[in-house]
Structures are given as C-alpha cells and as structure tokens.
C-alpha cells in the first residue's frame, strides 16, 4: 500500500454562528495547515498515487485568501475538513486541518 501526504498552507477568514457568545462569532482569520492523505495499492501510469499538484490547486483556488462563510455555511474546522476531503478525489482517505497550534480536526473514511 502506498501513501502520500500533501501539506498545503492557506490564509483564510471566517466566523461562526454559535448559540453562545464567543470571539469566534466575529470575522477573523487563520493561517491553516491542511494535510491531505491519499493511498492506493498501485501507482498510476505516471508512477504516483495521485497528482498532488491537482489537489493543491483545487484547495488553494477554493480557500486561499477567501472568506470561508461564502463557501461553507458553518466553517468549523470539522466542516472544513469534510469539504477538503470531498475536493480531494477518490484516493483520499483522511484530511487534517490545523487552525492553530492547539486546534486540529480530522475527517477520514
């Protein structure tokens, strides 16, 4: 089994619509670190699990320097991870989103 991990850094803003008071309800930004994990039993004709540049381009185009609320209705780390997972193709089995040094979320199948 082959596994590749693509790490992508983006800057984006968002706010959360929470049922309680929180500073996260105000528009603010993060320097996200996104890790996309892909695997396959075999390599494609180019000798790769997948083309990591296509994954990076899709994520950067969707997220970098954007307001995430315009893309994802409630852009929590968890919802962002699922959205990235859905963008990343059939070889993707896990996505890890780092919002801050102390806050990470993982979505995996």
List each model region and its residues.
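Charge-rich, low-complexity N-terminal segments
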Residues: 1-109
């Amino acid at each position: 089994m082959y596994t590749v991990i693509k790490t992508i850094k983006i800057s984006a803003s968002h706010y959360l619509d929470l049922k309680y008071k929180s500073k996260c309800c105000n528009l603010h930004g993060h320097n996200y670190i996104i890790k996309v994990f892909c695997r396959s039993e075999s390599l494609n004709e180019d000798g790769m699990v997948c083309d990591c540049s296509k994954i990076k381009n899709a994520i950067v185009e969707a997220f970098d320097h954007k307001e995430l609320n315009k893309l994802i209705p409630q852009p929590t780390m968890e919802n962002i991870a699922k959205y990235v997972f859905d963008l990343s193709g059939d070889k993707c089995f896990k996505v890890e989103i780092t919002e801050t040094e102390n806050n990470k979320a993982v979505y995996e199948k």
